[in-house]
């Protein structure tokens, strides 16, 4: 359903971005960001600072929050003593600064939340040390076929968030189908987690409700023999938790809140953005965080063009999802990327940066 909001022209976007960057750089010197200078893990140890979230993707609006992401090196003492820290997070400013070793670990897994830090627009890096520049110059070391599983995993999680948001504002029979789909997704992993059982031993389906307060209801046909009671109790608990989670958040004000604040359409937009980034990594060997080419398409999704009159994702949007899944699968099959990153070269990069710190720090 069209929201009626006109998309800004590229020229207007560019002017707004330049003004934003000026204000953002100015804000970093303010009191709210004093922790960047006073935290013992940060200060002169910061290797890079950059934009995160919607500002980094180019999907921000005038009401978007500012997210800052970055990396900080270890001290000489921490390097020599084998010590480290995980990250520094400041909730008030939506800032996360990863310790260099943790960032390297996440980058090797092609973690979407961190690999995007390596693909910002040049002007979106708010600070870069020599070590930070060296890391960016070697960004391709971290690109591998692991992107398929990591990005697909994040996309699946985003799809479930979208599906959950959609279910919470749906009519009862539709919501029941969403619950059933979530249970079926969980049930796929039961054979790996619990004692084996025949494929047709647990059948889940929807039929006319016995509960007078419902139109449709989920039913179970179960045929298990000599099955461990504790495993069955755990399986039942997993399914019950899913039903309970929908019941907690599926009512009244929160549903309308999700629609009013465009949360559903934002989940839909980020799902497509993840597929786009994954395809670029697999096909081009590049991390492209700022989605200039698809900006208008992504913003149309965010603005609700692919929601119907009931605020549900349209059939067309689900077709788009399937198209992107197919593109990712094709790209994965034909990519030139290695199966895993070159651990030897990454180790050499880490050693070079650590050696520089040890020699320079007095």
Feature locations, PLM:
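Catalytic metal-binding acidic patch
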Residues: 53, 57-93
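Conserved NTP/Mg2+-binding pocket subregion across the NTase superfamily
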Residues: 91-263, 267-270, 289, 299
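Short, Lys/Arg-enriched N-terminal segments with co-localized hydrophobic residues
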Residues: 4-18
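Short, solvent-exposed loop/turn segments at secondary-structure junctions
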Residues: 54-57, 74-76, 122, 279-280, ...
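Helical scaffold of the NTase/Pol beta-like nucleotidyltransferase catalytic core
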Residues: 17-50
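Small-residue hotspots
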Residues: 271-274, 278
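Structured mid-to-C-terminal alpha-helical surface segments
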Residues: 24-29, 141, 145-155, 159-160, ...
């Amino acid at each position: 359903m069209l929201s009626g909001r006109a998309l800004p022209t590229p020229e207007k976007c560019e002017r707004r971005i330049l003004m934003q960057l000026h204000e953002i750089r100015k804000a970093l010197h303010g009191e709210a960001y004093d922790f960047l200078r006073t935290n013992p893990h940060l200060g002169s140890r910061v290797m890079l600072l950059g934009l995160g979230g919607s500002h980094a993707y180019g999907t921000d609006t005038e009401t978007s929050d500012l997210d800052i992401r970055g990396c900080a090196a270890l001290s000489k003492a921490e390097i020599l003593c084998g010590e480290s820290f995980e990250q520094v997070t400041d909730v008030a400013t939506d800032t996360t600064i990863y310790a260099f070793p943790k960032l390297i670990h996440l980058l090797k897994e092609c973690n979407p939340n961190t690999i995007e830090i390596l693909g910002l627009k040049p002007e979106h890096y708010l600070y870069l040390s020599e070590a930070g520049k060296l890391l960016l110059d070697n960004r391709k070391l971290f690109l591998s076929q692991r992107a398929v599983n990591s990005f697909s995993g994040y996309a699946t999680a985003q799809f479930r968030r979208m599906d959950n948001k959609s279910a919470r504002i749906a009519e009862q029979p539709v919501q029941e189908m969403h619950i059933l789909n979530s249970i079926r997704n969980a049930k796929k992993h039961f054979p790996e987690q619990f004692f084996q059982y025949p494929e047709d031993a647990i059948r889940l389906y929807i039929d006319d409700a016995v509960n007078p307060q419902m139109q449709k209801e989920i039913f179970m046909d179960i045929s298990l023999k000599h099955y461990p009671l504790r495993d069955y109790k755990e399986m039942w608990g997993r399914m019950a938790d899913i039903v309970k989670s929908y019941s907690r958040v599926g009512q009244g004000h929160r549903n309308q809140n999700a629609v009013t604040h465009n949360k559903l359409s934002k989940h839909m937009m980020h799902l497509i953005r993840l597929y786009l980034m994954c395809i670029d990594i697999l096909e081009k060997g590049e991390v492209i965080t700022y989605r200039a080419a698809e900006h208008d398409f992504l913003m149309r999704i965010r603005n609700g063009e692919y929601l119907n009159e009931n605020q549900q994702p349209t059939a067309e949007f689900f077709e788009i999802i399937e198209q992107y899944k197919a593109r990712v699968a094709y790209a994965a099959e034909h990519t030139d990327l290695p199966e895993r990153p070159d651990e030897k070269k990454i180790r050499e990069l880490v050693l070079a940066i650590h050696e520089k710190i040890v020699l320079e720090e007095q």
